[in-house]
């Protein structure tokens, strides 16, 4: 009988000790996100969370998202500390547009070979995003899968659950001609359009770390974390009658604003009401991207659009500005014939 080599999981490329080390590293930052409704801590088979008692008819709202190929850029530039904020932002911003308060968040981190420092940096960013949105990070999955990813490449996904009072759900049904549209400024491209961003960098042979734009590197502009609007929007909803909110993500203006508009209405946007941030002008000029394609791919400096009665528009801008947002009146809702475009951008 020949002696056989004894194989272990680590020999196959999965380091359980590294996974345990990661959990120990992140416990402190995760604890900082805790909400009173959360029961228990990390390590259970499932996370337990009670519904806040202030809701009479609580409706749960859920969402899941990733950060697209912004992640590839972050990996290429070896900047892992803010991509977690992007991940949370993409999920919680989708919830708050329906009037929902984010309750808890879970993440999925998958890699071919677990680098504990990188993973801890990403999850610390996730915890920061949860703190910014008042959301508890209740658990996650770290999957080390040799052969599935190249080297130490990784992917992340986020899952969020929020709650809204049934009578206060914002679904766009109250939108009517004459409503005003108020914009909330974006921090940058957020987490959309990065395949085009990377193509422009490639074709133009641009090094984003060596290219200066408006006083900082292009890399800083492109990796600026997605703005989290949760606290500003929830505060606005408490004080004013909000008819609809659109989160400008993939599909830009053309596809996201119509998602909250009833039939027979259209959003008329005044392009002169704001100036594109420098990064968008650079992308358009360097990539020779058409105006239509820019508005289809990027937020062009507008992270959210709020529809509300015209007489409340000035107050909304005032309240949002007091919350630290850059806000302005960007357009109006008009009546539209059947089959007409639902978004018009007037130069």
UniProtKB/Swiss-Prot annotation:
<dbReference type="InterPro" id="IPR010918">
    <property type="entry name" value="PurM-like_C_dom"/>
</dbReference>
<dbReference type="InterPro" id="IPR004733">
    <property type="entry name" value="PurM_cligase"/>
</dbReference>
<dbReference type="InterPro" id="IPR016188">
    <property type="entry name" value="PurM-like_N"/>
</dbReference>
<comment type="pathway">
    <text>Purine metabolism; IMP biosynthesis via de novo pathway; 5-amino-1-(5-phospho-D-ribosyl)imidazole from N(2)-formyl-N(1)-(5-phospho-D-ribosyl)glycinamide: step 2/2.</text>
</comment>
<dbReference type="GO" id="GO:0046084">
    <property type="term" value="P:adenine biosynthetic process"/>
</dbReference>
<dbReference type="InterPro" id="IPR036921">
    <property type="entry name" value="PurM-like_N_sf"/>
</dbReference>
<keyword id="KW-0963">Cytoplasm</keyword>
<keyword id="KW-0547">Nucleotide-binding</keyword>
<keyword id="KW-0658">Purine biosynthesis</keyword>
<keyword id="KW-0067">ATP-binding</keyword>
<dbReference type="InterPro" id="IPR036676">
    <property type="entry name" value="PurM-like_C_sf"/>
</dbReference>
<protein>
    <recommendedName>
        <fullName>Phosphoribosylformylglycinamidine cyclo-ligase</fullName>
        <ecNumber>6.3.3.1</ecNumber>
    </recommendedName>
</protein>
<keyword id="KW-0436">Ligase</keyword>
<comment type="similarity">
    <text>Belongs to the AIR synthase family.</text>
</comment>
<dbReference type="Pfam" id="PF00586">
    <property type="entry name" value="AIRS"/>
</dbReference>
<dbReference type="GO" id="GO:0005524">
    <property type="term" value="F:ATP binding"/>
</dbReference>
<dbReference type="Pfam" id="PF02769">
    <property type="entry name" value="AIRS_C"/>
</dbReference>
<dbReference type="GO" id="GO:0004637">
    <property type="term" value="F:phosphoribosylamine-glycine ligase activity"/>
</dbReference>
<dbReference type="GO" id="GO:0004641">
    <property type="term" value="F:phosphoribosylformylglycinamidine cyclo-ligase activity"/>
</dbReference>
<dbReference type="GO" id="GO:0005829">
    <property type="term" value="C:cytosol"/>
</dbReference>
<dbReference type="GO" id="GO:0006189">
    <property type="term" value="P:'de novo' IMP biosynthetic process"/>
</dbReference>
